[in-house]
Amino acid sequence: FKSFSDGSLGSRSAKLYTDYADDPGNTGILVISPEDLAKRMYKAYRHGLQPATHCIGDKALEVTLDAVEYCLQQGLKDGMTPEEQAKRLPFRIIHAQMATPELIERMKKLPIVLDIQPTFLMTDLHWIEERVGKERAVLSYPWKTYLDAGLIMAGGSDAPVESFNPWIGIYATVTRQDMDGYPVGGYHPNEKVSVYDAVCMYSKNVAYANGDQDLMGTIEAGKFADMVVIDRDIFHIPENDIKDIQVLNTYMAGIERYHRD
């Protein structure tokens, strides 16, 4: 059940704590009041739906976490047991592009999954510092920091806004570069994610986000045999080549559904 808390960095409508560096006086917008967002999310949560909230700016993230906490507290007041709450699908925070250390500490205590779109960075890295300032740019797209904090990230594309090609998404996660390999070494390379963790983001973590971790996401006995065969070993090629990976075969439930000629 999707909601929107704010806009985007490109349009300067993502809600920030302070002014945009290139637009003094503008902190972006909340597209829904904090109170209404919390009530909307709780209505979905109470009826067994999975709340998923678009959230890009740091202030929008704070408002969204407030709403998650409200849902959990209100659920207890309405008779839900902690055990019942633990069985619910995790709250999904879509994008989570900016986060302060304080917000990350709050997220560590909540049943959430971060829906990350790494390909956003391939475009944004060219102007993000000008848009939000160097200090906040350091706090943007902090994937390794999220990982080190124990947060679960599920990789996505936001297609058709960006390419749906997962190999490009994994490439962006691992290199933090655009398609031309800019910047050399990657944008804030301390936030790079390993190839293994990036693959997990696009497989097992997505299954977890959907509540399907017992059915898919890893190749194990008893799970659906949904898998692909690719033309090179992603763990033993130069990182720059990841974006060029091609699928040779696609299997669903163990049946070949695609074969590349």
PLM region descriptions:
Residues 1-50, 78-79, 104:
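Active-site-adjacent helix-turn-beta-strand microarchitecture at beta-sheet edges
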Residues 42-52, 59-91, 96, 101-105, ...:
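His/Asp/Glu-enriched, well-ordered alpha-helical/loop segment
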Residues 260-261:
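Extracellular/periplasmic ectodomains of large secreted or surface enzymes and adhesion receptors
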